[in-house]
Amino acid sequence: MSVPGIVPEFARIAPDVKLGRDVTIHGLVNLYGCEIGDGTMIGAFVEIQKKARIGRRCKVSSHSFICEGVVIDDECFIGHHVVFINDRYPAAVNPDGSPQTAADWQVIGTRVERRASIGSGTVVLCGVTIGEGAIVGAGSVVTHDVPPRTVVAGNPARALRRLPA
């Protein structure tokens, strides 16, 4: 597969990945079963899992992890080291002590709406929606929905102010 900005031996892009036009992917990425929209840039050391969808003209900065069930709409910014979580109660073993497998958990989706911006080092827990045009400050832990055009920050992230329409 030929993609601008990639040295193939340093990137793992599975055959089931759907890449839009003019996507730029920097080396040392792991992409499988995902969809990436036109004009989006994916930084180095990023993993995007199956059934995740990234919209058009987004920027996903280096070292970020976008797991199954995450939908990022058009024109969003994802800072460095942003982590999305898709399992509300992660565990290594079941109550009986047997190792957990993929069949033992339920994926809970997350949505990032158009033109939202997520600062570096943020953790986004499952089941939340980050509203259109919202800004999440660096290092935040997002545990609840973020309303559109709202600036949030902290652990847990709290609303700091509303942005003009």
Regions found by a protein language model. Give the residues of each.
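Flexible, glycine/small-residue-enriched loop-and-beta-strand segment within the central core
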Residues: S2-P15, I25-C126, N155-P156, R161-P164
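C-terminal/domain-terminus segments
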Residues: V128-D145, R149-V151
